[in-house]
Structures are given as C-alpha cells and as structure tokens.
From Swiss-Prot:
Taxonomic lineage from the root: Eukaryota, Metazoa, Chordata, Craniata, Vertebrata
Region span, OMPdecase: 221-481
Record GO biological process: 'de novo' pyrimidine nucleobase biosynthetic process; 'de novo' UMP biosynthetic process; UDP biosynthetic process
Gene name tied to this protein: Umps
Name under which the protein is recorded: Uridine 5'-monophosphate synthase
Record has Lipoprotein as a keyword: no
Source organism per UniProt: Mus musculus
Region OPRTase, residue ranges: 1-214
Length: 481
C-alpha cells in the first residue's frame, strides 16, 4: 500500500532541498553516467528529517501487513534508519557487518539471533537489488527468515523483480517516477530533466532470471569510462590517477614482470622497455646483487620513461610484521616501490600495517583477489572479502590482482598476470590467457607479462606486440555500446 501523497510530497521536497536528490551528470559506481544521483547519507546530521524518513518506512511496513521479529538495515546508509525505527518502536535490531572483523566476536551479524524468527530488511535506495540480496543471504545463513524488504526509493531499474525472483517482496515508500512527478509539480526540475532521467532508467534496467529458471536476456553493454576519465573521478586515489593518466598518454596498459636475478639485466630491461610499459613489476628478493643504489637507478629510469614500480611482495602477515617488512630490513621497499600487493588472508590488519608506512609516502596497495595458478583457493567468498576490504581502505588500496574484473567501481584498477599471446599453461600450474580475453572479455585493465617478453629473442619487439594487443583490446571494449 502506498504512503499517502500528502505525507510523501513534503518529504520528497525536503529531501531535494537538502540535496539528497541531485540532478545533472554523475558517474555511478558502475561507471555509468547518470542524470540523477541519490545520496541519503547526509540525513544523519538532520535528526528531524532522519526521524521522518524512519517513520514513513515503518508505516509502509505496517500498511503492508508484514509480520516480523527484528529489523536489519543494509549497511551503511540504512543502519541509522533501522536504529531509529527499532528505538522508537521497541523492536530488536540486528547489525550486519560488511566483513568479519579480526577481533572481538568476529561475527557478521551482531545482536540477539533467534533462528527461525523473521527479520525485516530496511534499505534507502534499491537499483538492482544486489545490496538487499547480500544482506538477505547473510541473515539466512544465521537461520533467520527474510520475506520482505522496505525501501525509501525504488529506482525502477529491475531491483523489485530481481528480489521477487528470490522470494523477497519489496515495498517502496516512493518510486523514482513518483519522485520526478512531485519535483516537477513543485517546479524543482523541468520536463526536459524528467525526460532525461526516464530515458536513462529505461535504457539501464537490470533483468532478473526468468521464473522458468532460464537465464535473463543478455543486457546490452554500456559504454564505459576511458582511463583518462577514470583518472578524473573524485574518488580515484592520486596514485591510481597518475597511473591512469600515463596509461592514456603512452597508450599502454602493459606491466612488465621483470623476474630476473641480476641487477644489470633489470636496469637494462627498464631502460629498453620503459617507453612501452605503464608499470614494471619486481621481485627484489630474487636479485642476487640487490642494493638500494640499484633501486635508486631504477627509480630514475621510471621517472624518465614514465612508469610506476610495483614490488610483487605479496605481504601476508599480521599488521605489525608487514609494517616492518615494508619499511625496513634489507630491501626498504617503501622507499622506492610506488605500489605493493597483499593477501587478504590475515584480515584487514595487513592493510592497516602497510598503510601506516605507505600513506605518508604517497604509496598504494593492490589486494590479491584472484590468482592465475591452477587450483588457486582465491575464489568465491575470498574474492568478495578482498573487494570489501578494498572498499573499506580505499584511501590506500587502489585495486586488485585478479583474473577478471571483480569490482564495478571505476576508481579501482584490475591487473591480471598469466598473460600470453596464445592461451595455455606450464608444467607448474600457471595458466595463460590472451590480452583480448583478459582485457576485452574479462574487463581487466592491465596485463602483467613476464616470460612472454623475457623469453623472446627480441624483447622490445615482443613488448610492443603485447602493448598493442592489450591497448587494442581496451579500445574495443570502450567501443562496445
């Protein structure tokens, strides 16, 4: 049952006035450019408005006749809404974490859980329904029943149908169409803007699986942002912006994996292939003659040829230990490496430890979300945990080592190892994919190539072949509409 228009109209208008609803041109986390942007986070600083929104959400649940024992807000914007609802109406609340903490109870759901009881999910905005489903799945794993979700605004992009296909009824206080109608009547927006928003919504609907179990029709891909455009996004890390700009300028998304054992060869590779690459990946612990002077020379070459240095250290210990490994010891990695990487197995402490050293030096980190070796355990929930950790520490983490795109946020970079011009593998379990497969089909940004170049008779010629193949795959991906 819809909320009475006399209550809805003033609420929509006030939300517009406090800039919860914005119109213009905005880049969404999917990379799409949208004429409307909805951001309700600011209402936490407006207690009266926060209470109004919470009350209208609760009334919507009552009007729908929903029976429930507890309430859980989708993190993070819906958490304060759920808190106000539960406090005002004396209802038990559950809090869902985005990731398990490495201390305390280590639980994903906090609060008194009674398996078999029904939990009502609260959300601020629904687009595809994915965030609601993630919360539903976590609650169901705790033995709770979830049948309904209440949302303030349904963007009408397929989320309701997607949730319905999973047995979840979505009840919206307001739809995007209703919001547009109210704001146009109040002369907050004109007919042209209403038309632009409606066209955008119609062209970007997320399809749910059919009830007969068949997969949804293939959705037409939308043109994504170029490297240059991604560099200018307000949420892009400064070092990621630098990398994206030099990639655009040099027309290269090739990272050379310089796994050599002699410093002289490392420097020769950097000098000869520097113009063809955007990054040079090192394994300094395999250099027989490592010195900090060598790294000083490498840093000078990186500056001359405009590429970044990525030390493939794969940190995987507790925070205090990785901090020391990064900052001191024989290699003093933080003093010369622009970027390092880390496993997520130890929990967020590994990032926090690296961050304490790297942030003041304007360094950055990649998280290992997937690996190119046969039998890798970096899949499924492990990959999801890596994405969640990156989002939580985006001031230091700039992306992932992965076999494909694992996050739709254009601010994050994806680097893929195990690339050769021909697919295949080696006797130690390394699996190879082509640049077209990795960049064009799997949505990665940068290919990491080692043996395909190092084993070639003419390394510069081989590097140029990989550079061109990867860049052409990127351009082809941009051209898809």
């Amino acid at each position: 049952m819809e909320v009475a228009s006399q209550a809805l109209g003033p609420l929509v208008t006030e939300l517009y006035d406090v800039q919860a609803f914005k119109f213009g041109s905005f880049v969404l986390k999917s990379g799409l450019s949208s004429p409307v942007y909805i951001d309700l986070r600011g209402i936490v600083s407006r207690p009266r408005l926060l209470s109004q929104v919470a009350d209208i959400l609760f009334q919507t649940a009552k009007n729908a006749g929903i029976s429930f024992d507890s309430v859980c807000g989708v993190p993070y914007t819906a958490l304060p809404l759920a808190t106000v609802i539960c406090s005002a109406n004396h209802i038990p609340m559950l809090i869902r974490r985005k990731e398990t903490k490495d201390y305390g109870t280590k639980r994903l759901v906090e609060g008194e859980i009674n398996p078999g009881q029904t939990c009502l999910v609260i959300e601020d905005v629904v687009t595809s329904g994915a965030s609601v489903l993630e919360t539903v799945e976590v609650l169901q794993k705790e033995g709770l029943k979830v049948t309904d979700a209440i949302v303030l605004l349904d963007r009408e992009q397929g989320g309701k149908d997607k949730l319905q296909a999973q047995g979840i009824r979505l009840h919206a206080v307001c739809t995007l169409s209703q919001m547009l109608e109210i704001l146009q009547q109040q002369e907050k927006i004109d007919a042209d803007m209403v038309g632009r928003v409606k066209r955008f919504i119609q062209e970007n609907v997320f399809s749910a699986a059919n009830h007969n179990g068949l997969p949804p029709p293939e959705k037409k891909a939308c043109k994504e942002l170029s490297f240059g455009a991604r560099a200018e996004l307000p949420g892009t890390h400064p070092l990621a912006s630098k990398l994206l700009r030099l990639m655009q300028k040099k027309e290269t998304n090739l990272c050379l994996s310089a796994d050599v054992s002699e410093a002289r060869e490392l420097l020769q590779l950097a000098d000869a292939l520097g113009p063809s690459i955007c990054m040079l990946k090192t394994h300094v612990d395999i250099l027989n003659d490592f010195t900090l002077d060598v790294m000083e020379e490498l840093t000078a070459l990186a500056k001359r040829h405009e590429f970044l240095i990525f030390e493939d250290r794969k940190f995987a210990d507790i925070g205090n230990t990785v901090k020391k490994q990064y900052e001191s010891g024989t290699f003093k990695i933080a003093s010369w490496a622009d970027i390092v990487n880390a496993h997520v197995v130890p929990g967020s402490g590994v990032v926090k430890g690296l961050q304490e050293v790297g942030l003041p030096l304007h360094r950055a980190c990649l998280l290992i979300a997937e690996m190119s070796s046969a039998g890798s355990l970096a899949t499924g929930n492990y990959t999801k945990a890596a994405v969640g950790m990156a989002e939580e520490h985006c001031e230091f983490v700039i992306g992932f080592i992965s076999g494909s795109r694992v996050s739709m946020k254009p601010e994050f970079l994806h680097l893929t190892p195990g690339v050769q011009l021909e697919t295949g593998g080696d006797h130690l379990g390394q699996q190879y994919n082509s640049p077209q497969e990795v960049i064009g089909k799997r949505g990665s940004d940068v290919i990491i190539v080692g043996r395909g170049i190092l084993a070639a008779a003419n390394r510069l010629e081989a590097a140029e072949m990989y550079r061109k193949a990867a860049w052409e795959a990127y351009l082809s991906r941009l051209a898809v509409q």
